[in-house]
């Protein structure tokens, strides 16, 4: 039986041809293994693009909320989610604003947050993401080797509420586990 990564191959090829930045096969396989192991119930994705990574994130039955600033890509993602049987709430808007608003309303809500949008915005959402993720929940961020992620990488590696490892795969990812909900 084909796994989800194999089924995503045509979308991966099309994305590369059209210049749509996606996770790709190698990091996709890593993420799929994490999703299978962690089985997150509630997932937040910042940066939907055409839905490639969202399909992986939602493939184990978790409830996916995903935020995309480009309305055309958001519509495309909705179609791709439907095609792959992924239940997702697609929010068209700015991820930084969405997270800020949500963090003012709820805390300890998501089991997993996946960040893969404007690199300079990673640091802007970090504190709100920490509020939103449950204790022992995870924040995964893509592209840690990018210059725009430097401040974020430094922050997650030294944050007192997180245990973080940098995954040396392609252009690196970070895997941060929330270890405390206490005010420090």
List where the protein language model places each region.
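Rossmann-like AdoMet
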Residues: 1-23, 36-37
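SAM cofactor-binding core of SAM-dependent methyltransferases
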Residues: 23-97
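Hydrophobic "anchor" residues on beta-strands that sit immediately upstream
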Residues: 41, 64, 89, 112, ...
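Active-site flanking residues adjacent to catalytic metal/cofactor-binding acidic residues
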Residues: 44, 67, 93, 115-117, ...
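Hydrophobic packing residues within well-ordered alpha-helices of enzyme cores
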Residues: 57, 77, 81, 99-102, ...
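Short conserved AdoMet
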Residues: 62, 107, 134
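A short acidic, Gly/Pro-enriched loop at the edge of an enzyme's catalytic core
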Residues: 102-112
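C-terminal substrate-binding/active-site "lid" region of AdoMet-derived donor-dependent transferases
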Residues: 119-184
């Amino acid at each position: 039986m084909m796994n989800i990564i194999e089924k995503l191959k045509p979308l991966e090829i099309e994305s590369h041809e059209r210049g749509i930045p996606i996770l790709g096969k190698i990091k996709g396989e890593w993420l799929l293994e994490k999703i299978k192991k962690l089985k997150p119930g509630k997932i937040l994705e910042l940066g939907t693009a055409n839905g490639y990574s969202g399909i992986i994130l939602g493939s184990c039955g978790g409830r996916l909320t995903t935020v995309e600033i480009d309305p055309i890509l958001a519509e495309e993602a909705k179609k791709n989610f439907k095609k792959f049987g992924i239940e997702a709430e697609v929010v068209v808007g700015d991820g930084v604003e969405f997270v800020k608003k949500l963090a003012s309303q709820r805390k300890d809500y998501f089991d997993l947050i996946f960040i893969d949008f404007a690199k300079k915005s990673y640091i802007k959402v970090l504190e709100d993401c920490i509020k939103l993720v449950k204790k022992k929940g995870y924040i995964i961020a893509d592209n840690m080797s990018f210059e725009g992620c430097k401040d974020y990488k430094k922050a997650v590696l030294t944050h007192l509420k997180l245990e973080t490892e940098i995954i040396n795969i392609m252009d690196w990812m970070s895997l941060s586990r929330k270890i405390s909900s206490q005010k420090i």
